[in-house]
């Protein structure tokens, strides 16, 4: 899943390890989420949202546009 996690982390000058500590996950988990190899659980997504003070949908892009771009 595409996301803004790397950008948000960089804006705070946090390493992946530092963000992992804030979220109680490993540096490897942060890397996997940032690169889209792993989708966070809903509780983790909420934790990320609270940490950065942004709605989940502004951090994560699930690729669903609600039919906005449907051809018909």
Which positions does each model-derived feature cover?
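Short, charged recognition helix plus adjacent turn
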Residues: 50, 60-72
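Recognition helix of helix-turn-helix/homeodomain-like DNA-binding domains
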Residues: 25-38
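Short, basic-rich loop-to-helix N-cap that marks the start of a DNA-contacting helix
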Residues: 37-47, 65
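Key DNA-contact positions within bacterial/archaeal DNA-binding proteins
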Residues: 17, 28, 57
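Short basic helix-loop element that most often maps to the first helix and adjoining turn
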Residues: 3-22
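DNA major-groove recognition helix of helix-turn-helix/homeodomain DNA-binding modules
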Residues: 43-58
């Amino acid at each position: 899943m595409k996301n803004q996690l790397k950008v948000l982390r960089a804006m705070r000058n946090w390493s992946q390890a530092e963000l992992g500590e804030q979220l109680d996950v490993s540096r490897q988990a942060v890397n996997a989420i940032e690169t889209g190899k792993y989708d966070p659980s809903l509780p983790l997504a909420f934790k990320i949202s609270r940490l950065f003070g942004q709605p989940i949908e502004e951090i994560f892009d699930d690729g669903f546009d609600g039919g906005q771009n449907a051809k018909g």
